A protein has these predicted regions:
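Outer-membrane beta-barrel translocator domains and adjoining extracellular loop/strand segments
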Residues: 24-31, 54-64, 96, 101-120, ...
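Transmembrane beta-strands of outer-membrane beta-barrel pores
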Residues: 6-8, 17-21, 47-53, 85, ...
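Outer-membrane beta-barrel initiation region
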Residues: 1-12
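Outer-membrane beta-barrel translocator/channel fold
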Residues: 46-99, 183-208, 222
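Residues that define the transmembrane beta-barrel architecture of outer-membrane proteins
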Residues: 25-29, 71-77, 124-130, 159-165, ...
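Transmembrane beta-strands of outer-membrane beta-barrel proteins
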Residues: 11-15, 41-45, 87-93, 142-148, ...
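Solenoidal tandem-repeat scaffolds enriched in leucines and small polar residues
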Residues: 75-138
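Residues on the lipid-exposed face of transmembrane beta-strands in outer-membrane beta-barrel proteins
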Residues: 2-4, 31-35, 77-83, 130-136, ...
């Protein structure tokens, strides 16, 4: 990411994707301001958006045909507070609008069965994310960060709307030549309503683990 800091006011302008987002495979871009508040921590506010649209099936329930893909775009705002009141607590809140170019979920099924399920399966709408974490720093430039994660999808289709609650544990180690970051996540997802095509909710227990290795100054470039 690109950053510029005004030394007198300790105000920073930033643009790009933060490394803590990238290691979670969240490539949302940010344009915003970050301000040091003395011993009260660092607050930041930013616009969030995706430069490269994500591709999904326009109708994931279509069968017997070649499915077509569609782009998903999102934009919104994020507020973050690092080192809350001088502590090792970190928090952020993100809200964004999700817009699909061609949302056709359930349309083929409706045409074949004479139903009216498409509105319940609409994936356009709003997403809200909250995270509260605590950082432990210990010997050898190592970091351990447990976090509570909450996500709510208030989508136009009630059968696609859901709430996520989870726990995440991040471990990081930084060396002079390389760095390593790993994440362990477990959570639950509960949908507001049953999927009308399958007659049941797609509630799920979630588990994820990932690791990212960084090599500094590759080919001598800083």
């Amino acid at each position: 990411d690109i950053r510029y800091t005004f030394a007198d006011t300790r105000t920073q302008i930033f643009l790009g994707n933060l490394i803590q987002d990238a290691v979670r495979f969240d490539f949302t871009q940010q344009l915003g301001l970050r301000q040091e508040m003395g011993d009260k921590g660092i607050v930041a506010t930013s616009l969030v958006f995706n430069v490269m649209p994500v591709e999904l099936w326009s109708d994931p329930f279509a069968t017997g045909v070649d499915r077509s893909s569609t782009d998903v775009k999102s934009k919104g705002a994020r507020f973050a507070w690092d080192k809350i009141w001088g502590s090792n607590f970190y928090g952020n809140l993100t809200t964004r609008e999700v817009d699909m170019d061609e949302e056709r979920s359930g349309q083929q099924y409706d045409q074949s069965h004479g139903t009216h399920y498409a509105d319940l399966l609409d994936r356009n709408g709003k997403m809200h994310d909250m995270e509260l974490s605590y950082q432990w720093h210990f010997g050898g430039n190592q970091l351990l960060e447990p976090a509570i994660v909450y996500k709510q999808a208030r989508l136009d289709g009630s059968a696609e709307s859901f709430k996520n609650t989870g726990l995440k544990l991040t471990y990081a180690k930084r060396g002079p030549q390389w760095s390593f970051v790993s994440n362990l996540y477990t959570g639950k997802r509960k949908y507001d309503e049953a999927n009308p095509i399958f007659g049941q909710r797609a509630d799920a227990d979630e588990f994820a683990i990932n690791g990212t290795f960084f090599w500094h100054n590759l080919f001598g470039v800083n």
